[in-house]
């Protein structure tokens, strides 16, 4: 099978959600010809993921499933769960979460795979699926081709399920709806301590560089109820401008921001983007806001300029990070869309820093930075950083079960 026949794109499978009941051959036609995603197709994907598990690293059959807040996601999750459980997977639901939370859950639960039901910064009429392996790396092209081929083969078979079994198997083996927020808060607290040990404390180094209050925009998503409160607990004077009761990604979030965007003060006040409209006047160079995308795996900052505001993109964030720890060499990766001067700057800061250029997509950053065996990073391979100008930042984190 050729990669071109794969259902997967740059970052998983995505499509406009239609919840009508269709035959499986029609479900395949819809996703291929009309970019339309149906529960029938998601069931096929679930079955295919189970059947192809032997081609993934790791052991066991646990699959962790999380999702962002889109109106069609519950039906898609039920269909995916049905497919997974029909073919022998043990399914754990962790409820609404960010994509990094799902990544963390794969490690915490020792899962063979993880599935995030999301379409990232796309409108809520869309959804899709991102797949992670037991090490937390996103699926590769060969595996995606394997899954796609299996989907096509399954659609040619008769696999009817009676109503009673369908209802039972659409529910997870283990339901942990409150797990995500608690786990993500705990994880961030650990990371905060690690960053302070590496870069110094927030109160000593950072406040004068940030507006007060500093605006946070979680795109009306998972972090909108708790992230600003977490940051305030750690000394950051900040304010969340999005709302969990509003529509995901609508008039907010990083998805509507270009890495090169700028605004005058008047343009910002007239912007339909909720966070941009609320930006406070600030001294030139001061950071005034941060926006996440819908599934929380991408971030862009906004900085005050002489005449208004400008986006601080992933390249600029990487430069800040490398400058803050220039006393040690980094393994650094950036996509082909990054500024051509970025690698030169990294090696000027520390000549022993190694730089790798990748294709577009944060998974390629992870692949470039991981060990040759595709497994865990170890202390001897740190520090590492991958960046896209769109705001994907890839950094290593201690395994949740690793000793202190």
Show where each model-derived region lies.
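An N-terminal, well-structured beta->alpha segment
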Residues: 1-80, 86-87, 113, 170-214, ...
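Short glycine-aspartate micro-motif
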Residues: 7, 112-116, 215, 287-291, ...
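Active-site flanking residues adjacent to catalytic metal/cofactor-binding acidic residues
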Residues: 10, 67, 216-219, 292-294, ...
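Flexible loop/turn segments at secondary-structure boundaries
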Residues: 16, 72-73, 101, 123-124, ...
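Gly/Ser/Thr-enriched, mixed-charge loops and adjacent short helices
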Residues: 16, 127-283
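N-terminal small/polar loop signature for handling phosphorylated ligands or for N-terminal nucleophile
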Residues: 55-126, 229-302, 358, 369-374
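Proline/glycine-rich low-complexity loops and linkers
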Residues: 94-96, 149-187, 305-397, 401-404
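Short beta-strand-to-turn element immediately C-terminal to the catalytic PLP-Schiff-base lysine
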Residues: 131-134, 300-304, 394-397
């Amino acid at each position: 099978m050729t990669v071109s026949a794969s259902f997967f794109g740059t970052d998983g499978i995505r499509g406009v959600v239609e919840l009508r009941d269709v035959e499986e051959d029609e479900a395949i036609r819809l996703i291929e010809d009309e970019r339309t995603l149906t529960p029938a197709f998601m069931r096929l994907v679930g079955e295919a993921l189970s059947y192809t598990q032997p081609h993934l690293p790791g052991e066991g059959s646990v699959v962790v499933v999380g999702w962002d807040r889109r109106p069609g996601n519950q039906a898609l999750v039920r269909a995916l769960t049905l497919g997974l459980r029909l073919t022998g997977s043990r399914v754990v639901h962790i409820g609404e979460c960010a994509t990094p939370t799902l990544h963390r859950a794969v490690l915490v639960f020792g899962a063979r795979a993880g599935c995030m039901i999301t379409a990232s910064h796309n409108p809520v009429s869309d959804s899709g699926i991102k797949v992670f392996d037991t090490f937390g790396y996103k699926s590769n092209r060969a595996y995606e081709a394997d899954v796609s081929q299996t989907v096509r083969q399954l659609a040619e078979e008769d696999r009817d399920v009676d109503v009673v079994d369908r209802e039972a198997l659409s529910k997870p083996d283990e339901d942990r709806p409150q797990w995500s927020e608690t786990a993500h808060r705990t994880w961030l607290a650990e990371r905060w301590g690690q960053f302070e040990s590496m870069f110094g404390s927030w109160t000593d180094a950072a406040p004068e560089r940030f507006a007060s209050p500093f605006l946070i925009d979680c795109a009306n998503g998972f972090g909108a109820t708790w992230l600003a409160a977490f940051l305030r607990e750690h000394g950051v004077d900040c304010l969340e401008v999005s709302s969990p009761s509003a529509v995901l990604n609508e008039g907010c979030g990083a998805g509507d921001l270009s890495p090169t965007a700028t605004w005058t003060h008047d343009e910002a006040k007239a912007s339909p983007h909720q966070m941009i409209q609320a930006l406070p006047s600030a001294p030139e160079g001061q950071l005034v806001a941060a926006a996440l995308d819908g599934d929380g795996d991408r971030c862009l900052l906004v900085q005050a300029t002489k005449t208004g505001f400008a986006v601080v993109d992933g390249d600029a964030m990487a430069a800040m990070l490398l400058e803050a720890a220039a006393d040690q060499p980094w393994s650094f990766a950036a996509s082909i869309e990054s500024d051509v001067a970025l690698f030169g700057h990294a090696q000027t800061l520390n000549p022993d820093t190694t730089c790798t250029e990748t294709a577009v997509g944060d998974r390629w950053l992870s692949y470039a930075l991981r060990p040759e065996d595709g497994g865990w990073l170890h202390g001897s391979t740190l520090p590492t950083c991958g960046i896209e100008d769109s705001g994907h930042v890839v950094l290593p984190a201690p395994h949740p079960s690793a000793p202190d």
